[in-house]
Design a protein with these regions (language model features):
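Conserved catalytic-loop position in the HRD/HxD motif
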Residues: 145, 150, 155, 168
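Helix-rich C-terminal or lid/interface subdomains of diverse kinases
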Residues: 186-188, 200-255
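Active-site Asp-x-Gly
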Residues: 159-209
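Active-site beta-strand-loop-beta-strand hairpin of nuclease catalytic cores
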Residues: 15-22, 158-164
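A conserved alpha-helical element in kinase catalytic cores
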Residues: 9, 16-87, 188
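A glycine-centered beta->alpha junction motif in the catalytic cores
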Residues: 50-70, 105-116, 219-234
Length: 255
């Protein structure tokens, strides 16, 4: 059956003649079927290879809402992240696709390679990178796992039935799970709830974990600054830089 499509960048709302709607996206992550099986992402309906070499996939259309920052403290979200981070099949699939483990040093190198030139020349951001180089945390490859890489609240969808899904897998990578955890805590969880959040997730609450949280928290701000800058969202670029300053001023003095 043919579809009508309404394009929003590389995403589409497709509708069949009978009125059934689907969400269509170009060149999405090949791990979507595995994510759907784990009930982390919406159900995948089909995939097709187009004549120009691009891949098109269709997922079930979800009627619901995007989570707000105030929604991000739910235990349901921690449960989804735990399921993602502990999924050996997803991790093995990424490895077969050519993804390699990224150590903290690799992450810093990746940022320097991928960040726009204007950010590379930013004096304050360079000082942050220098500090991160001097304080690289320990890394155990056997503890590394699949991470989403961009846990903004706008990438979480709640259906009318109350199911929550994580979408937009363009930033997925293999690294320390603290990559995702630090983003959550630094951006959405008040400090007085960090202990409960971390212990519910499965971390011990000690100085080693907090030092790692401080390091990956800074990196999460750098990542978001880059994403917003690439999307020409300068208001959020400035908000993230300001939030990074506040985070460093507040927690850096305690170490």
């Amino acid at each position: 059956r043919r579809q009508r499509q309404m394009c929003i960048r590389d995403s589409y709302m497709g509708s069949y003649p009978d009125g059934k709607r689907v969400f269509v996206k170009m060149n999405t992550s090949p791990i979507l079927p595995g994510l759907a099986r784990e009930q982390i992402a919406p159900q995948l309906l089909w995939t097709r290879r187009l004549a120009d070499g691009r891949d098109m996939c269709a997922q079930e259309w979800l009627t619901g809402k995007i989570l707000t920052p105030h929604d991000m403290n739910r235990k349901q979200i921690i449960n989804i992240l735990t399921r993602l981070h502990r999924s050996r099949p997803l991790m093995k699939q990424l490895s077969r696709l050519g993804y390699t483990m990224e150590t903290p040093v690799d992450l810093l190198q990746s940022w320097k390679q991928e960040a726009p030139e204007v950010l590379k020349r930013h004096q304050y951001l360079n000082s942050v990178i220098d500090d991160l180089r001097r304080t690289v945390p320990g890394f155990r490859e056997d503890h590394a796992t699949i991470v989403h890489g961009d846990l903004r609240h706008s990438n979480w969808i709640e259906t009318e039935s109350g199911l929550v899904y994580l979408v937009d897998w363009d930033s997925v990578r293999l690294t320390d799970r603290m990559f995702d955890v630090a983003h959550m805590l630094c951006h959405y969880i008040p400090e007085q709830h960090w202990h409960d959040w971390l212990t519910y997730y499965g971390y011990k609450y000690n100085q080693t974990v907090l030092d790692k949280l401080y390091w990956y928290g800074q990196y999460s701000y750098l990542s978001q600054i880059t994403k917003y800058f690439v999307n020409q969202d300068l208001d959020n670029v400035n908000r993230e830089i300001y939030a990074l300053r506040v985070f460093r001023d507040k927690y850096g003095k305690r170490r």
